[in-house]
Swiss-Prot record:
Residues 23-141, 160-280 form the EamA domain. The gene is sam. This is S-adenosylmethionine uptake transporter. Transport is inhibited by S-adenosylethionine and to a lesser extent by S-adenosylhomocysteine. Unlike eukaryotic transporters is not inhibited by sinfungin. Also inhibited by 2.4-dinitrophenol, suggesting transport is an energy-dependent process. Keywords: Amino-acid transport, Cell inner membrane, Cell membrane, Membrane, Repeat, Transmembrane, Transmembrane helix, Transport. The lineage of its organism: Bacteria, Pseudomonadati, Pseudomonadota, Alphaproteobacteria, Rickettsiales. Its main location: membrane. It is found in: Cell inner membrane. It comes from Rickettsia typhi (strain ATCC VR-144 / Wilmington). Belongs to the drug/metabolite transporter (DMT) superfamily. 10 TMS drug/metabolite exporter (DME) (TC 2.A.7.3) family.
């Protein structure tokens, strides 16, 4: 095995670790959401996330928290609060696999938002594929049938919030340190979550607190795993493996919640996955063309 292949395989392994951690987070969130309100889950999740990040702040020094965009950090925190509370609540309504497929639609929302917020020009092929992707969502959610539960739309609202976060990150991540973006968004989300969570407060058990700590700290681990992966392989090379999360989620949901993906989820995934893959590869090609022309 040559060195290039070894590096590639290591990078993919790091990326797969991020997928496993993400799936574990969804399973934990669904479990906690059956007893604790999503506001309270968000409060503890980001409180523990802030605590976990504190040693890194001390190590790198206060200067790493200096920011020119405090309003942007507040906006990110508000979006994260809305997105995570909607996602946690949605997980109590829908199967984990359905939520996972909906998360695959985030690039579709990001593309549309980029047109209005970043004034990006989108080629017609990407518009066509985006429409196809949304058709996949409709196929999966079945809004035209009596089985449709409107509360599943909380997951769609969460996906839109995460797409908004992607847009903000795309515009400001080069101007801010990664640590400051993580720390401030966690602090803001915890602060915003506290007063609303008091309305629905249920004192967590020691086991639930342990799970909440895992939930809070694992977000940083996901970022670490992704950064390690992207130092070894190109982000585009990991794109096909992104959808293994559906397999991981399906296995976890089956053994823990006795859930099994229905046909509509499978049909929706078959439509959404190729659509988002095309968008990612198209964006990569567009970025490469821009660099070559400079």
């Amino acid at each position: 095995m040559n060195d290039a292949l070894k590096t590639y395989l290591k990078g993919i392994c790091w990326f797969l670790l991020s997928l496993v951690t993400s799936s574990v987070n969804d399973v934990i969130s669904k479990y906690l959401g059956t007893r604790l309100h999503s506001f309270e889950v968000a409060f503890f999740r980001f409180l523990f996330s802030s605590i976990v990040l504190l040693p890194f702040v001390v190590y790198y020094g206060k200067s790493t928290l200096k920011t020119r965009h405090p309003v942007i950090h507040v906006l990110r925190g508000l979006l994260l609060f809305f997105g995570m509370t909607s996602w946690t609540y949605g997980l109590t309504i829908a199967p984990v696999t359905t939520a996972t497929v909906i998360s695959f639609s985030i690039p579709l929302f990001t593309l549309i938002l980029a047109v209005f917020i970043l004034n990006e020009n989108i080629i017609w092929q990407r518009w066509v594929v985006t429409v196809v992707g949304f058709i996949g969502l409709v196929v999966m959610l079945k809004p035209h049938t009596k089985d449709f539960n409107p509360e599943i739309l909380y997951l769609i609202l969460a996906a839109i919030s995460f797409a908004m976060l992607d847009i903000i990150n795309k515009k400001f991540v080069v101007k801010e340190s990664m640590l400051s973006m993580l720390f401030y968004s966690a602090i803001v989300t915890a602060i915003v979550s506290l007063p609303v969570s008091m309305e629905y407060w249920i004192t967590p058990s020691s086991f639930e607190l342990t799970l909440l700590f895992v939930l809070g700290s694992s977000g940083s681990f996901i970022l670490f795993f992704l950064l390690k992966a992207f130092t070894m392989v190109d982000a585009t090379a990991t794109a096909p493996y992104r959808y293994l999360e559906l397999v991981i989620s399906a296995i976890a949901a089956y053994f823990i919640f006795n859930e099994f993906p229905d046909k509509s989820t499978a049909h929706g995934a078959v439509i959404i996955i190729p659509a988002t893959l095309f968008i990612m590869y198209s964006e990569k090609k567009s970025m490469s063309s821009k660099h070559e022309s400079q």
